[in-house]
Amino acid sequence: MKRFLLSVLFLYGIVFPACCKTDIYVVAVGISDYKNISDLRLPEQDAKDIAKLYKTKTKHVILLTGRYATKARILQSLRDQFARADEDDMIVFSFSGHGYQGGVCPYDMSRDQSSGITYKEIRSILKQSRAQRKMIFADACFSGGIRGGSSSANINDKDSGVLLFLSSRSGETSIESGMMKNGFFTAYLLRGLRGGADVDRNRVITAKELFSFVHNGVVEKSDGQQHPVMWGRFDDGMVLMDWR
């Protein structure tokens, strides 16, 4: 009788329901050649490499680069992509390009900050998603200005489950190097997510592990000129990448 009952449970998906499979939804943006402001060298490669990494884990990846990364298209992509996520899923917005204190610069950014995309706008879209794990990675100058430049790995914030990992403190630039194919922050972010941050070798990358790896690597590589910051209300053990 017990054997029959167990068979029925498996048959109807009660023991291991398919609905509980975790998926990842990603929007990766990189802008090197801007319409109205100065150009950069590495952001589009940053975005392509982030997208390539996540494509090994999910089919739900949107990549926007150059002239395709307008303000309207970025915001619509975030809304459409993240609305598809379920509660057990994870959503990721990665941006590489120009930034200002409080936001990031789309392709059609002008000298007027109203043409930019504020972190408040981005977080508002993330908060509407059902996903419990929500991440923003931003490799952009002055990105830490959103929170006054704190370097804490777990700053109290009202947006539960939203993790922001930003490449620099307020007032700092995010460094590009001719010796590397990615910006300092994205280079260490990629290394960390690929396994470099897995200090306990359990094939799971947590928020605490990633912050320590990226922060220490970037500070050393930049000779103390750039300090990545992470904040939001989240558990230090929040899983950001699972290679099991």
PLM region descriptions:
Residues 3, 7, 16-244:
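Cysteine endopeptidase catalytic domains of the caspase/legumain-like
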Residues 11-12:
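Repetitive helical segments and hydrophobic/amphipathic motifs
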